[in-house]
């Protein structure tokens, strides 16, 4: 799970973690956890915090070490691809703003992201996401594709 985080996210979480690891022993107490998460833009409820701690606090001592913290943050990040973020991503792909991502727009965006794809690979991506079979990806199809990753 933590292997899905970027190096930048890991560095950010390490900084956040060490910020609240007051005694420098490499662990974060349950009380500190909420503060840490809020500092990196997450906003968990008390119940969510408790659930997250219970999931990773293997020895039940109420503290979390850094690898456990990374795993937990990776889970949380995966769950919070907000609709707003997905809409922004869709709009980034939909260059002409017509509400659909064409093969050309997808190819253009993937090239910008450093992915050199063949026409066949682009067509395959469209086919996988194109539920209604019209040859392009609408917003609903894009959301389904993003949520399944």
Curated annotation (Swiss-Prot):
Instruction: Spell out which residues are annotated as carrying N-acetylalanine.
Output: 2
Positions of Ca(2+) 2 binding? 57, 59, 61, 63, 68
Keywords of this entry: Acetylation, Calcium, Metal-binding, Repeat
- Binding annotation for Ca(2+) 1: 21, 23, 25, 27, 32
SMART domains listed in its UniProt record: EFh (SM00054)
Q: Which SUPFAM superfamilies match?
A: EF-hand
Which Pfam families does the entry mention? EF-hand_7
A GO MF label: calcium ion binding
Which residues are involved in binding Ca(2+) 3?
94, 96, 98, 105
Keyword Metal-binding recorded:
yes
Provide the residue positions that the database annotates as binding Ca(2+) 4.
130, 132, 134, 136, 141
The record's section on InterPro entries has: CALM/Myosin/TropC-like (IPR050230), EF-hand-dom_pair (IPR011992), EF_Hand_1_Ca_BS (IPR018247), EF_hand_dom (IPR002048)
The EF-hand domain covers 8-43, 44-79, 81-116, 117-149
Q: Quote a single Gene Ontology cellular component term.
A: myosin II complex
The extra comment attached to this record reads: This protein has four functional calcium-binding sites.
The family line of this record is: Belongs to the calmodulin family.
Outline what the protein does. Calmodulin mediates the control of a large number of enzymes, ion channels and other proteins by Ca(2+). Among the enzymes to be stimulated by the calmodulin-Ca(2+) complex are a number of protein kinases and phosphatases.
Protein name listed in UniProt: Calmodulin
Species annotation: Achlya klebsiana
Q: What is the lineage of its organism?
A: Eukaryota, Sar, Stramenopiles, Oomycota, Saprolegniales
In the UniProt record, the gene name given for this protein reads CMD1
